[in-house]
Amino acid sequence: MRPGLHAAAVAVLALTVLPVGCGPKTPDYQSIWTRTTTTPTTTEAPVPFAQYLKDSGVSGEPVAPDKLTDLTVSIPTPPGWEKVDKPNIAPTTETIAKAGKLPTAMLMVFKLDGDFDAADLVKHGNADATLAENFRLLDQSGANFHGFPSSMIEGSYDLNGQRLHTYNRIVIPTGSAPDRQRYLVQLAVTSLAEQAAPDAADIQAIIHGFTVAAK
């Protein structure tokens, strides 16, 4: 089992660096600041995504988005944002930030190996967000993204004394023939909840400009 895939699956919220067919709806920013916990209705306790991957025998090799030969994966860089390199972030992860701090966007790609149902896998992609401290759900979707199985969740949570707003999308695309390799692509955008409204234009530009397509 390659550790990179499972470590990254749980790292996005912890690092705070961190369409949609119809595009995400405008968040209710007032509700972002509240700490009243809300979680999606479910009959079972959420299984952390990393645990689900491990239990399903799925392994993955990290690949830099710009090194893919059979898939196009990219996000735009809004004015005032720049690429960020940090020792605690894998070099294969593309990270951009505004003025070198929050808000941030993190883009990760993994080449997958294992026998799994992509449509079922993405159903577990939102679990980690719902398990965050005082998580409040704003929006979620299980609709395909550019024709590929996908899940999206948006909400706010507490971390290290701060209230954060997060948008997280997981996509399981298939590369072009002949290999038709399957990948896990994750985009996470994180901002301070109190700055979510002022930063909305930049964040929406990243979300709407997120591209996943076979070459």
Regions flagged by a language model, labelled:
Residues 68-72, 100-104, 148-150:
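Extracytoplasmic
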Residues 93-122:
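A short acidic-to-branched-hydrophobic micro-motif
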Residues 126-174, 178:
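Signature of long, low-cysteine stretches enriched in small and polar/charged residues
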